[in-house]
Every structure is written in structure tokens, then in C-alpha cells.
Curated annotation (Swiss-Prot):
Keywords: Protein biosynthesis, Transferase
Entry-linked PANTHER family: METHIONYL-TRNA FORMYLTRANSFERASE, METHIONYL-TRNA FORMYLTRANSFERASE, MITOCHONDRIAL
Catalysed reactions listed for this entry: L-methionyl-tRNA(fMet) + (6R)-10-formyltetrahydrofolate = N-formyl-L-methionyl-tRNA(fMet) + (6S)-5,6,7,8-tetrahydrofolate + H(+)
Name of the protein: Methionyl-tRNA formyltransferase
GO cellular component: a single term: cytosol
InterPro entries attached to this UniProt entry: Fmt, Formyl_trans_C, Formyl_trans_C_sf, Formyl_transf_N, Formyl_transf_N_sf, Formyl_transferase-like_C_sf, Met-tRNA-FMT_C, Met-tRNA-FMT_N
Record EC number: 2.1.2.9
Record has Transferase as a keyword: yes
Residues that, per the record, bind (6S)-5,6,7,8-tetrahydrofolate: 111-114
The species this protein was found in: Ehrlichia chaffeensis (strain ATCC CRL-10679 / Arkansas)
Protein family according to the UniProt entry: Belongs to the Fmt family.
Entry GO MF terms: methionyl-tRNA formyltransferase activity
Keyword Thylakoid: no
């Protein structure tokens, strides 16, 4: 089967690697996002992980800004793919492109659709305290994450999973499911999603920890937004990379954000946040014990 692969971030890598190991399938071209400026003054252009792997395997790489233009669609048509595989590509796939391959476009989506449609399904599964999540391989249509389900599998969410560890588990699961779908694509019966069960995600832009939230919710936020969740310690950003929590039945009168002891336990709504690994802006990550030995905790401001 001739395949065009569309993907960009690290999450896409296991799927592409799985395809490259298959003798019955050939990746004839890769589509990925444009290299981004990086380094001091943005003088270095950084290619996506998919771009790098494609070049290492002598696969044609395309980095269009959009697939809406006729000449981009004509290029895909000329490649004559049997199927297009889309994994966290980052561009909208127009209906004109969806209809080019014999088997259409199939997508690896890291949730149990129709739960958590949208851009941040793994984050939302952790934030919401879901006990399980999974991967859906779907037949793409012109609607956002509403295509028919070709295959779906679930996995448990471990209490210590953060966005990195859970993403890796789902990425690996999705890559094996992809091969199963491609090898059996003529025999699969697509299943329509139940729109009544749909839930949606939005791009996450707020990484600040609000101590007025419940401590358990804050711990989930730290895991879901790793390594970006932060609070302000004496007006400097302090990232909380790992934390635990406990009930606070004896501390109801304290204001949220209060540092309640020398271990830097922080009063929150209905609980106490127990930081374990932190990173002050401009510094390296460290254990909370190392942090409190280097900074004065008493009379500190936590917001």
C-alpha cells in the first residue's frame, strides 16, 4: 500500500517508524510543519522529528503552509496514494485532499472518541481525573474529530502519569493499532460516533496554579501541564514539576496560598499541596528539600 504520512511532533514518530518497518506498505512522501526558528536570535531552523526521520530514510518531505491551494492538492493527487495517515500534523486537511486516496485519510486520535474531541485530548483526560483513556483510529471527514471509528482501544491512566508518560503510552499503542487497521482495511466496519456523548477540548494557555482550587485538582493540573504549571514564589515563577496532596481537616481557617510549614506545604482549597520537585525561573530543577535549603521559606509570598 502506498502511503503519504502527515505528522509533526514526537507523538507522530512511533507511527511513522512502524510503517517504515512494514514490507507491505511504502511511505512515498511525508508532510510536516515548516522548520521553526530556534536558538539565540532565532538563527537556527529546527526541523520536526518527522522531518528528520523522513530525511534519514530518503523519503520526500513537503512542508506547505497550507493544503488549501490547488497546486498542493495537485501534487498529492500526482503521488497517487492508497491512503493518507495523519498523526498530529497541525494543518487542516481540506475535503478535496480527503477524497484523493482510495482509502481516504485515517487519523490516530489519542482519546476514546467521541470523548475529548479537539486539540488537547491527553491533557483533558488527566485534568478531568479520567481513570482510562485510549486511542481511536478514525476515517477522517470534513468535520473536526467526527469521523467514523475504525478501531479503538483503551488503557488505564496511572496516578503518576503526566502528559509525557501518557503521551508515550498512547503513541506506542496508536502505532501498533495503525498497522492492524492498514492490514485489515478491506474488512473493517466503520462505526459512527454518538454525538450525544461528545466532549470537547480547547488549546490550553493558562499554566498558573490557582491555590483557590482543590489540591487534588491542582495535582492533576501539574501532571497534565508538565513541565509548565507554575505559581509565583516571591514574585518569581516557580514551576511545580511533581507534587502530592493531602486533606486539611485542621487547616480550614488558613488562607489558600499559605505556606504552612518548613517543608513548603501549601494550603489550597480542601487540601494541602505537597511540592516534590520544583524549578525556579532561571534555575535547574531540584527536589523540594534542596530548594528549601537554598531559599528562605518563612514569610515567603505564594500566589
Amino acid at each position: 500500500m502506498k502511503i503519504i504520512f502527515m505528522g509533526s511532533p514526537e507523538f507522530s514518530v512511533p507511527a511513522l517508524c512502524a510503517l517504515l518497518e512494514e514490507k507491505d506498505h511504502e511511505v512515498i512522501a511525508v508532510y510536516t510543519r515548516l522548520p521553526k526558528p530556534a536558538g539565540r536570535r532565532g538563527k537556527v531552523l529546527t526541523k520536526t522529528p518527522i522531518h528528520i526521520i523522513a530525511e534519514q530514510n530518503n523519503i520526500e518531505v513537503n512542508t506547505p503552509k497550507s493544503l488549501k491551494h490547488d497546486y498542493e492538492q495537485e501534487k498529492i493527487f500526482a503521488l497517487n496514494p492508497d491512503v493518507i495517515v495523519v498523526v498530529a500534523y497541525g494543518l487542516i486537511i481540506p475535503e478535496a485532499v480527503l477524497s484523493i486516496p482510495k482509502y481516504g485519510c485515517i487519523n490516530i486520535h489519542p482519546s476514546l472518541l467521541p470523548r475529548w474531541r479537539g486539540a488537547a485530548p491527553i491533557h483533558y483526560a488527566i485534568l478531568s481525573g479520567d481513570e482510562q483513556t485510549g486511542v481511536t483510529i478514525m476515517q477522517m471527514n470534513e468535520l473536526w474529530d467526527e469521523g467514523d471509528i475504525l478501531l479503538q482501544r483503551d488503557i488505564p491512566i496511572d496516578e503518576q502519569d503526566n502528559i509525557d508518560t501518557l503521551s508515550q503510552k498512547l503513541s506506542n499503542l496508536g502505532s501498533s493499532m495503525l498497522i492492524e487497521v492498514l492490514n485489515n482495511i478491506d474488512h473493517l466496519v466503520p462505526i459512527k460516533q454518538n454525538a450525544n456523548d461528545a466532549t470537547y477540548t480547547n488549546k490550553i494557555i493558562d499554566f498558573h496554579i490557582d491555590c483557590n482550587e482543590e489540591a487534588q485538582v491542582i495535582c492533576r493540573k501539574i501532571r497534565a501541564l508538565y513541565p509548565k504549571a507554575f505559581l509565583f514564589f516571591n514574585d518569581k515563577r516557580l514551576r511545580i514539576l511533581k507534587a502530592n496532596y493531602c486533606p486539611d481537616s485542621d487547616l480550614q481557617n488558613l488562607k489558600p496560598g499559605t505556606v504552612i510549614n518548613s517543608h513548603m506545604h501549601i494550603k489550597c482549597k480542601n487540601g494541602v499541596l505537597i511540592p516534590l520537585i520544583v524549578q525556579l525561573e532561571g534555575k535547574n530543577p531540584c527536589s523540594i528539600n534542596d530548594f528549601i535549603h537554598g531559599y528562605s521559606i518563612s514569610n515567603s509570598s505564594i500566589t
